[in-house]
Amino acid sequence: MSQYVVCALYKFVELNNYQELREPLLALMEKHHIRGTLLLAGEGINGTVASDRAGIDTLLEWLNTEPRLTGTVYKESYSETQPFNRTKVKLKKEIVTLGVEGIDPRHVVGTYVKPQDWNDLIADPEVFVVDTRNDYEIEIGTFKGAVNPNTETFREFPDYVKENMDPAKHKKVAMFCTGGIRCEKSTAYMKEQGFEEVYHLEGGILKYLEEVPQEESMWEGDCYVFDGRVAVNHQLEKADYDLCNACRLPITDEDKQSELFEQGVSCPKCHGKHSEEQVERFREREKQVSLANQRGEQHVGGESAKQRAQRREAKLAKKAAQRKQA
């Protein structure tokens, strides 16, 4: 059994006081050695974190003690190593950024399709299948016959729809993403634009890979994930990709053989795109990482997680004492 449980989670729900959830959530994560990033916004929670089994269970139990976060959707996979360096809880305007005002998956959303029924849907010639993810994700793998919208960020997806899709022409649309959250927003947007039959893969690609046997699968390639594993194969095991620390894009062993590759500084995808100042900064960072590795330490910058946890627990205790005195 792998040592670390990787948990991707989200829930669209009204969180008027989401700012107040940050400190207790961060303190809990640091106390239980949970790394990764969670996003909080007025529309809900989203993120991916990793810890041992006990740590993840503690987090899920905490979420269930907050009535609005009960029933948070989550999916688990496993990693031999801790795939995150830091623990973060960020406050955002959106938990997944589409950049279009008024899109609310709690009120209108596409039709969910179970992984077991997905093959039949996308094999239908009348169904227009769209991968809502970004170029660098699709390059690694996608479903057979799916259209690549050629977007660099999710914010560009509405423009793709406006320029390339028509409710009168595309009567049936099927969409998918890594874990399901982007499709919550994209299908809600499509419905608002007048598309009537809009479907999306429930649980996303990760759930499909988990539940559909590889011999029956219509998935081709590997699946990009937003953690240190970079990508997973059909068995949800780490695939043969690394991350360029300069541009944060996935790279292969072949990329690392290129004369344009310099560890931590550039790869064939980003060589020549950074300023001299950035390149020097990347080289200095790589030097510090190397020195930290030689000392048997982990270079993540700033104070340690233990120090941050102690400081936050003291801050929460002080606030609790002040409330009792009030």
Curated annotation (Swiss-Prot):
Comp. bias (Basic and acidic residues): 278-288
Domain annotation Rhodanese: ranges: 123-217
Signal peptide: none
Keyword DNA-binding: no
Pfam families to which the protein is assigned, alphabetical: Rhodanese, UPF0176_N
InterPro entries for this protein: Rhodanese-like_dom (IPR001763), Rhodanese-like_dom_sf (IPR036873), TrhO (IPR020936), TRHO_N (IPR040503)
Enzyme class: oxidoreductase
Sorted UniProt keywords: Oxidoreductase, tRNA processing
Any one GO molecular-function label of the UniProt entry: oxidoreductase activity, acting on paired donors, with incorporation or reduction of molecular oxygen
Record CDD domains: RHOD_YceA
Catalytic activity as recorded in UniProt: uridine(34) in tRNA + AH2 + O2 = 5-hydroxyuridine(34) in tRNA + A + H2O
Residue ranges that the Swiss-Prot or TrEMBL entry lists as coiled coil: none
Region feature Disordered, mapped onto this chain: 278-326
Any GO BP annotation: tRNA modification
Active site (record annotation): C177
Gene3D superfamilies the UniProt entry points to: 3.30.70.100, Rhodanese-like domain
Purpose of the protein: Catalyzes oxygen-dependent 5-hydroxyuridine (ho5U) modification at position 34 in tRNAs.
Family per similarity comment: Belongs to the TrhO family.
The protein, known as: tRNA uridine(34) hydroxylase
Organism: Vibrio parahaemolyticus serotype O3:K6 (strain RIMD 2210633)
Lineage, top ranks: Bacteria, Pseudomonadati, Pseudomonadota, Gammaproteobacteria, Vibrionales
